[in-house]
Amino acid sequence: MNIREYTSDVARAVAFLSRIPVPASFFEGDDGKLARVSRAFPLAGLLIALPAAITFGVLLAFDADPLMAALLALAIQTVTTGALHEDGLSDTADGLGGGKDRDRALAIMKDSRIGTYGAVALILSFGLRAAALAAIGRGLAPLDAALTIPAAAVLSRGAMVWHWYALPAAKPDGVAASAGKPDYGPMQIALIAALILSAFLLWPSLRLPAFVLCLLVTVVAAFLFTRHVRQRLSGHTGDTIGAAQQICEIAAFCTLAMCV
């Protein structure tokens, strides 16, 4: 693997997955395709999660209420990402919840208006993550608690790449189809990076059993969601890729909260 190319992929992934400004030099010769760039999603997720993690850790170190610290960290994370994945979760919930068949579900997902299912999904997403982070903040030292945020970001970004790889594009003219689909190589690199980075972040404070359980629950969540999307839509969309990230991040946080 060419390190220079991988560095460029990380920068492009950060630009795609967040609102963090990236120097234009990293986009020279860029064709806009994300198939190869997807291998850098886990590391990019770690970098994107740093502002939220620092916020969470500093607030806990100053004895802030863990729930308040968790909500502020999630607010920082949402601003950093531009609610990219939350938007995908909301649209996917509306489509799968309100669409009686595949075509109707895809049409609903394309509609920018939020429906009941989407609103409930967002409330549950923020509520579950905030509750889990608050529990983590009460059970771990500030630094160890803060490291769970990039760890969940890493695992969920790896899971979204696998979801993207495992399914064909549901719409040939959709955004996800135009961005390209990861090949086996980039997908494998993304999963290996997610495994190594999450182990480095979690193992020192939570030890092997908690890390393995978190990994297993995240894998199961990704598999079950991907299977459901395959049955309902016969393929992925940009929205389902974002929803996969959110679902797996929730799964990781909730599992870690039960292990502290």
Swiss-Prot record:
Membrane topology: Multi-pass membrane protein
GO MF entry, a single one: adenosylcobinamide-GDP ribazoletransferase activity
Catalytic function, reaction form: alpha-ribazole + adenosylcob(III)inamide-GDP = adenosylcob(III)alamin + GMP + H(+); alpha-ribazole 5'-phosphate + adenosylcob(III)inamide-GDP = adenosylcob(III)alamin 5'-phosphate + GMP + H(+)
Superkingdom assignment: Bacteria
Pathway linked to the protein: Cofactor biosynthesis; adenosylcobalamin biosynthesis; adenosylcobalamin from cob(II)yrinate a,c-diamide: step 7/7
Subcellular location: Cell inner membrane
Co-factor(s): Mg(2+)
Extent of the signal sequence: none
InterPro entries (alphabetical): CobS
Enzyme class: transferase
Task of the protein: Joins adenosylcobinamide-GDP and alpha-ribazole to generate adenosylcobalamin (Ado-cobalamin). Also synthesizes adenosylcobalamin 5'-phosphate from adenosylcobinamide-GDP and alpha-ribazole 5'-phosphate.
Family listed: Belongs to the CobS family.
Protein name: Adenosylcobinamide-GDP ribazoletransferase
Gene source species: Rhizobium rhizogenes (strain K84 / ATCC BAA-868) (Agrobacterium radiobacter)
